[in-house]
Amino acid sequence: NYQIDNSILASIDPTKVFSGNINNIDTIREYIRTLSPISSQIEREYANSLVKTDDITTMQQYFYSFWASRNALSPQIEWENYYVQVKRVNNSFTAVRMKGYETDRGRVFLKYGAPDRIVENYNEAGAYPYEIWHYYTLEKQRNKKFVFMTRDIATNDFQLIHSDAVGELSNSRWTTEIYSRTY
């Protein structure tokens, strides 16, 4: 499990790694925020406190360390590949007052990749608009689904209401929730 070691962060010279080229504090803050869907709880807590500071050097060090811990040989390429997916998610799943990576669908997409199949039901009588994402293989699990629902299709904010994947929200009454729409 990845831990934040401040002595390791301090040993990183930002001028010698790719993150040192990110000189705008708002940009590095935003890049760090995009890591949340693939971060551990410890990383998320550390990052949330870090982006509240004005310490761009530590942000650059953390950003590099985050990617080096996932791909020691090519951390920059790992980041660039991930950022392509962040832009894709932002384009597809941005909701009112939320960037795509901040939404439930964006988080699931960034964490697990594109689903193998998506069933979209936006106009079913008596049902709120919903999507069911199927993953045939999900890490070490097989045939897993994620159910997203919105009460207002105009907002594009589909919230995760059920999954049978380990570690995700499980709700045995998800069908009742979807079909509780009254006119």
Question: Which ranges hold each PLM region?
Answer:
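Residues within mature, well-folded domains
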Residues: 5-183
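Beta-strand-enriched, solvent-exposed domains that form extended recognition/catalytic surfaces
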Residues: 1-2
